[in-house]
């Protein structure tokens, strides 16, 4: 209710409620680009888009928090983190998958996620309830993806029934996403979109390492590239944290 009151009073522009559509667009783009460029290249390219746009949204204060100057240290922190992901995925790159178009699309898709986080942060500053923000995000995202899915079913030979061919646990991703969006909507208001992005990258890499250790798939090996990437990621976090501390 507080969200729509803010829209009605013109404190919150209507278009900023489209955060969920940006996240849905990322998911849709991912399903098309990954088969072309591969998971590793898509991950690196989309992260590059996220970190670049995060510098801008923090600078203009789109998340509703304190505005941040695009300092050299913050740029270096972003570059270090992107480099860390490149190194962590180094042994999974397949150069035959290299496609300028696919990588460009992945960069754009990643930038949408950065803007989505900022918009969710701003929406949350009005709702004061992170799960209400998350609910709005998923309603708009689900509606948009459903629309795209219907269009695809009408104009291609892909059937919606194909969704049931995968394992049941793959549908848990959306449930986990509810908590992720709720948490990120609060966090970006305090630490900024860039620092949240850097920390979440570190978390994802650590999660990958834990899965490789405790739930390994056939042929899985603990990659020294992944471990190196984790250390470099948190070096980027430290660099960005020092930049934020120096402003105070």
Please place each PLM-identified region on the residue numbering:
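Glycine-/small-residue-enriched transmembrane alpha-helix faces in small-molecule transporters
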Residues: 25, 29, 73-79, 83, ...
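Structural signature of hydrophobic alpha-helical transmembrane segments
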Residues: 34-52, 97-112, 161-177, 224-231
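C-terminal-most transmembrane helix of multi-pass membrane proteins
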Residues: 85-92, 201-248
């Amino acid at each position: 209710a507080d969200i729509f009151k803010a829209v009605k009073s013109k404190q919150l522009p209507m278009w900023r409620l489209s955060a969920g559509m940006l996240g849905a667009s990322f998911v849709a783009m991912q399903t098309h680009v990954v088969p072309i460029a591969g998971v590793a290249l898509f991950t690196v390219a989309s992260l590059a888009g996220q970190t670049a746009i995060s510098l801008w949204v923090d600078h203009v204060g789109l998340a509703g928090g304190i505005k941040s100057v695009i300092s050299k240290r913050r740029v270096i922190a972003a570059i270090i983190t992107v480099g860390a992901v490149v190194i962590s995925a180094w042994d999974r790159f397949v150069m035959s998958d290299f496609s300028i178009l696919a990588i460009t699309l992945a960069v754009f898709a990643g930038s949408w996620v950065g803007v989505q986080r900022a918009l969710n942060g701003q929406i949350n500053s009005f709702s004061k309830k992170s799960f209400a923000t998350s609910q709005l995000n998923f309603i708009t995202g689900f509606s948009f993806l459903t629309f795209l899915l219907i269009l695809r079913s009408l104009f291609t030979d892909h059937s919606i029934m194909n969704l049931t061919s995968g394992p049941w646990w793959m549908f848990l991703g959306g449930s986990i996403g509810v908590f992720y969006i709720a948490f990120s909507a609060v966090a970006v208001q305090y630490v900024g979109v860039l620092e949240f992005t850097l920390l979440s990258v570190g978390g994802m890499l650590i999660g990958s390492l834990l899965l490789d250790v405790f739930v390994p798939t056939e042929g899985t090996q603990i990659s020294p590239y992944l471990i190196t990437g984790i250390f470099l990621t948190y070096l980027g976090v430290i660099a960005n944290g020092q930049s934020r501390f120096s402003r105070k």
